[in-house]
Amino acid sequence: MKLCITSLKNQKEFELINKLGEKFYERYFILVIAKKLPKIFLESKYNTFLGIKVSRKLNKKAVVRNKIKRRIRHLMRIIVNDSNFKAIKFAIIIIPKKGFEEINFSHLQYELSKIILRNIY
């Protein structure tokens, strides 16, 4: 079964997940994972809510920041549609750190999936 991912749309949703979620600090990114979601998220047809914060500190060029966002979205699609992933509702905010754009894709996938799978169940 293919699971659906939707993005967090406004500042209120980001603040809510920041308040309810648990933070995990890694070498290349910071994760905020909220397993207990408020009613507005539970009524949705989507299983996974994704928020991405890419600061201008990371890179001044919008092209590079957008590439980082595309990589993160693709990583999440791979992780959520993996056979080991169970369909539970959760929200996640990913904040990349310096050096994120230089790391190869397979290493990022391994790191991100390890952290997400370990902390949402």
UniProtKB/Swiss-Prot annotation:
Family assignment from sequence similarity: Belongs to the RnpA family.
Protein name: Ribonuclease P protein component
Pfam family, one: Ribonuclease_P
The keyword Cell inner membrane is annotated on this UniProt entry: no
Gene source species: Rickettsia prowazekii (strain Madrid E)
Primary enzyme class: hydrolase
GO molecular function, one term: 3'-tRNA processing endoribonuclease activity
Signal peptide residue numbers: none
Role this protein plays: RNaseP catalyzes the removal of the 5'-leader sequence from pre-tRNA to produce the mature 5'-terminus. It can also cleave other RNA substrates such as 4.5S RNA. The protein component plays an auxiliary but essential role in vivo by binding to the 5'-leader sequence and broadening the substrate specificity of the ribozyme.
InterPro entries per record: Ribosomal_Su5_D2-typ_SF, Ribsml_uS5_D2-typ_fold_subgr, RNase_P, RNase_P_CS
Keywords, comma-separated and alphabetical: Endonuclease, Hydrolase, Nuclease, RNA-binding, tRNA processing
Coiled-coil segments: none
Keyword DNA damage annotated: no
Entry's EC annotation: 3.1.26.5
Catalytic activity: Endonucleolytic cleavage of RNA, removing 5'-extranucleotides from tRNA precursor
Subunit structure: Consists of a catalytic RNA component (M1 or rnpB) and a protein subunit.
Domain of life, source organism: Bacteria
GO cellular component: ribonuclease P complex
GO biological process terms on file: tRNA 5'-leader removal
